[in-house]
């Protein structure tokens, strides 16, 4: 399985957290979440981080520079997973469940809070380009239905608990690990 993980440019990472984190802290937090997601995914295949940031380096992972929007990301041929970088609670079990879903479906969609899509897994030979931003999960369901693509939905805490807003930090502070939890706890009273 090949995985694509989009990652925002320096200065554009987690800007909605600016009311509780300065830019340096947001940068460290975003990088800590990215490293966590890459660490989990790398147990299942090759991971490629796609970013406009030409200075980004993630040890053991290919980094591709691209200015493409989320909806225009370069996607691999064959079977792939597209997973967001802001999932501090993502676990191997979450990814296993998503991959298991591909046994009976062409596409697996993983919803995030507020109706977003935090993971998309596509079976080899299936042409499906997801859409992102805002309430993208129902849009992706409709798109798949329109294309006649068989969809499985995997609901799990790891995919659901993305971090976009200050109130999302509590999950990372209480349930996260390592640097992600440490940074979240420095901002949220627990």
Swiss-Prot record:
Q: Which reaction does it catalyse?
A: (2S)-2-phospholactate + GTP + H(+) = (2S)-lactyl-2-diphospho-5'-guanosine + diphosphate
UniProt cross-references to SUPFAM superfamilies, sorted A to Z: Nucleotide-diphospho-sugar transferases
Q: Does the UniProt entry include the keyword Hydrolase?
A: no
What GO biological process terms does the UniProt entry carry, in alphabetical order? F420-0 metabolic process
A Pfam family of this chain: CofC
Keywords of the record, alphabetical order, are: GTP-binding, Nucleotide-binding, Nucleotidyltransferase, Transferase
* Gene3D superfamilies xrefs: Spore Coat Polysaccharide Biosynthesis Protein SpsA, Chain A
A GO molecular function annotation here is: phospholactate guanylyltransferase activity
Superkingdom field: Archaea
Pathway(s) served = Cofactor biosynthesis; coenzyme F420 biosynthesis
Enzyme Commission no: 2.7.7.68
Protein family according to the UniProt entry: Belongs to the CofC family.
NCBIfam families with a match to the protein in the record = F420_cofC (TIGR03552)
* Complex and partners: Homodimer.
PANTHER family under this entry? 2-PHOSPHO-L-LACTATE GUANYLYLTRANSFERASE (PTHR40392:SF1)
Function text:
Guanylyltransferase that catalyzes the activation of (2S)-2-phospholactate (2-PL) as (2S)-lactyl-2-diphospho-5'-guanosine, via the condensation of 2-PL with GTP. It is involved in the biosynthesis of coenzyme F420, a hydride carrier cofactor.
| UniProt-recorded name of the protein | 2-phospho-L-lactate guanylyltransferase
Q: What organism is recorded for this protein?
A: Methanopyrus kandleri (strain AV19 / DSM 6324 / JCM 9639 / NBRC 100938)
The gene from which this protein is expressed is: cofC
